[in-house]
């Protein structure tokens, strides 16, 4: 039995974590086994890598170092959490996955997309999400929400141009593969966003039950 792999993507302040929890609750209420996780992170080792990636520091991190750390955490996450859960037929809901790598390291940092694709194949093989929800909103709105949460991490401290490139990368990927991506307007009130998620539930339940 093969499970269902759902990823949630979008820029800072888009409400991914809140809506990840909401979607998981709705699926669990229907008797579906759900594994909630996040990237970078998801295992004790990968969470330590996350701390290195997100913590501001005196030494500037080289973009290639950043990219390799992201995929190192992902390799551990896949081996310990994602692949075993999918193998037993669970629904895996992950807050960020490889689309964020293309958006942040590819779009924001300007790294080679071909290099990212090579690492993607090396680490993931042919594993790709079955469905990706992209929570889109204007950059300035997302950054204001992130600032309101309190202390900013290393990525949240980046400027407008960085996040403009990140948003463009997400939208470009969603437009190129509409059968996998579902775009949501995250600038709406939360209740409206969750109504859009509810509209997906019948399809998700059908796929989760095989």
Curated annotation (Swiss-Prot):
Keywords: ATP-binding, Kinase, Nucleotide biosynthesis, Nucleotide-binding, Transferase. One of its GO terms (cellular component) is cytosol. Disulfide bonds: none annotated. GO terms for biological process: dTDP biosynthetic process; dTTP biosynthetic process; dUDP biosynthetic process. It comes from the Bacteria. ATP binds at residues 10-17. Its EC number is 2.7.4.9. One of its GO terms (molecular function) is ATP binding. Pfam families: Thymidylate_kin. SUPFAM superfamilies: P-loop containing nucleoside triphosphate hydrolases. It catalyses: dTMP + ATP = dTDP + ADP. Phosphorylation of dTMP to form dTDP in both de novo and salvage pathways of dTTP synthesis. Belongs to the thymidylate kinase family. NCBIfam families: DTMP_kinase. This is Thymidylate kinase. The gene is tmk.
């Amino acid at each position: 039995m093969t499970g269902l792999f759902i990823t949630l993507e979008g820029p800072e302040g888009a409400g991914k974590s809140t809506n990840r929890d909401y979607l998981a609750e709705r699926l669990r209420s229907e008797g579906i086994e759900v594994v909630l996780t996040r990237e970078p992170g998801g295992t004790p080792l990968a969470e330590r890598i996350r701390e290195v990636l997100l913590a501001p520091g005196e030494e500037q991190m080289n973009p290639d170092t950043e990219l390799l750390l992201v995929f190192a955490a992902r390799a551990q996450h896949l081996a310990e959490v994602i692949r075993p859960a999918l193998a037993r037929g669970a629904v895996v809901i992950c807050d960020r996955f490889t689309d964020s790598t293309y958006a942040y390291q590819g779009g924001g940092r300007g790294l080679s997309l071909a290099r990212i694709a090579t690492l993607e194949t090396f680490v993931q093989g042919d594993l790709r999400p079955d469905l990706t929800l992209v929570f889109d909103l204007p950059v300035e709105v997302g950054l204001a929400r992130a600032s309101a949460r309190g202390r900013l991490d290393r990525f949240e401290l980046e400027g407008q141009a960085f996040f403009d490139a990140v948003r463009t990368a997400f939208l470009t990927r969603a437009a190129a593969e509409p059968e996998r991506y579902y775009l949501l307007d995250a600038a709406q009130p939360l209740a409206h966003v969750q109504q859009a998620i509810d509209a997906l539930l019948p399809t998700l339940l059908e796929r989760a039950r095989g």
